[in-house]
Amino acid sequence: MVFEPWMVAPCGMNCGSCIGYMRAKDPCPGCRIDSDPKPSYCKSCIIINCDLLRETVSGFCHECPKYPCARLKSLDKRYRLRYHTSFFENLAVIRENGMDHFLAFETGRRTCPQCGATLSVHRPFCLKCGVNL
């Protein structure tokens, strides 16, 4: 899969590696796309619906005057513990090196070394070939 800039949520999540985006039946279109089918928890996401986010130039949380907010801290902690990925690190890469660098970084770490399929951030194995990571 080729990751695109629109796939990166304001919090730094790469929607292209989300299990909701990757599923075959009723895949989520991604955080930045306002259409169904989108899970209810995504529709009501505090971050994507944040008024302060709309005031940023880039559309990313790292430009917000309240960065990092309590919601982003909580989300980052949960993803670091459960999925070994940090939204703060993702946003830092975007801010310091640009979107192209981040997308190349994501492609490298989200590609199965066994079969080349896209890896989900939410699973410790490849959804295509089953190799444990």
Locate each region found by the language model.
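Short, flexible, mixed-charge glycine/proline-rich loop motifs
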Residues: 2-9, 18-22, 33-39, 52-55, ...
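Ferredoxin-type iron-sulfur electron-transfer modules and their immediate structural context
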Residues: 2-9, 13-30, 77-78, 82-93
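Disulfide-stabilized extracellular ectodomain repeats and their linkers
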Residues: 12-15, 25-28, 42, 47, ...
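Cys/His-coordinated zinc-binding microdomains
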Residues: 19, 32, 46-49, 54, ...
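Short Cys/His-rich "knuckle" micro-motifs
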Residues: 26-27, 38-42, 72-73, 120-125
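Short cysteine-rich clusters marking metal-coordination/redox-active sites
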Residues: 28, 61, 112-115, 126-129
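Mid-chain, well-packed structural core segment of small domains
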Residues: 51-89
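Extended, acidic-biased charged interface segments
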Residues: 68-71, 86-95, 99-111
